[in-house]
Amino acid sequence: MATHPGFDAERLGHLTAAVERDITAGLYFGGVIAVRRGGEPAYLKTFGRSGPTHDLPVAESSVFSLFSVTKAFTNILVFQAIEKGYISLTTPLCKVIPEFRGGLRERISFFHLLTHSAGLPSLFEARPGMCIDHMDEVIAAILEVALPVEPAGERVGYAPLFNHALMGEAVRRLDPKGRSYRDILREDLFEPLGMSDTSMGVRRDLKSRHLIPEFRGNYPIKHLGHSNLGPNGAFEEEFAEMPWVGCVSTANDMMRFAEMLRRGGELDGRRVLGRALVDAARTIWTGDKPNEFYAAGIRAAGGVAPPANLGLGFSIRGPQMGVSMFGALASPGTFGAHGAGTTLIWTDPERGISFVGLMTGLMTTIDNLWRWQRLCDIVHAAAL
């Protein structure tokens, strides 16, 4: 790739050396990293292989399970529903899902769900051992068991499942065409952005390029699917519908998504979101509150838990010096999303940089945090 005038080529090359050292040390198996500045390619490199069990070489066209980066797509669908006047940020969820009534549930708004301050438990599954690939079954279980542990707005605690599953169901119920969540996602987001290699579930034509995720014992639960494809088979299901973790994509498609965010909701002349909502999404709404989901692990590793710095569904670097996957050197307004132990996207509007990292070999939550901070700092340090 030709040298980008916005980067010091030698310093950006440190990124290649660092990832290769990590792979040699066995920290993870491989991946692909892409960097753009001002919309122009600056770095694109593949590394290693998918893993010891499904040992495919990583290619630029490889399809990765995105895990919780999927939540970023659900955020956009909620924003589009706001733009169309179906809901507002302060609309209580129970206005859209009447079954979600009673007690503290009725205080929970879309704002609380997006900022992970709804007071719902930070659980990975609604019922132990249930299949998670059918959205209707998961929603039925959530409506039965999801009881707030504290009033909405009191604390910040990342919700792996409940918040975005419920918002995905709300989007489905609000749709005047009666479409499935999967179809709304494809027709209202992926197709307008030209994300042709992105889908909810592993679309049949993508299966041969899909790198089946290796969890390496670093995740607290199984992810069962109805086809009985293994302990984490939900991530191989063609028709999975999981608004919190279920999408697959490529580095190229995810860069298109990141660039849309950097450009304020528009890409290649197609606007999928108004600038006001993008601005709201990248505004910190959680004050100085830490994210309780990560705080204990950071402290145990010898760090200081920083403020959560959450916008509307997106994480933000923030002005404080502290641990950040986006890099300690990132501009304060850098924002993006990450997925379990593997995937990361961010955009730095101040410097005009967009970053996509899709890796194989799932790391623990804390190791993943340190890994991305270290690698992303190389990118920031190389910027001119």
PLM-predicted stretches and their roles:
Residues G51, G103-L329:
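Short, surface-exposed loop or secondary-structure junction motifs
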Residues G13-E20, I33, G39, S62-T91, ...:
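Active-site SXXK
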Residues T3-L66, S88, W372:
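Short, conserved catalytic-motif segment at the N-terminal edge
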Residues G361-L384:
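Generic C-terminus detector
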Residues T334, G341-E350:
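Short, surface-exposed beta-strand/loop micro-motifs that present aromatic residues
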Residues F29-G31, A42, S180, G341-L344:
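Short loop/turn microsegments at loop-to-beta-strand junctions
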Residues A42-Y43, I345-W346, G352-G361:
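Short, well-ordered beta-strand elements
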Residues L89-G103:
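Short, glycine/proline-biased beta-turn/loop segments that scaffold the active-site neighborhood
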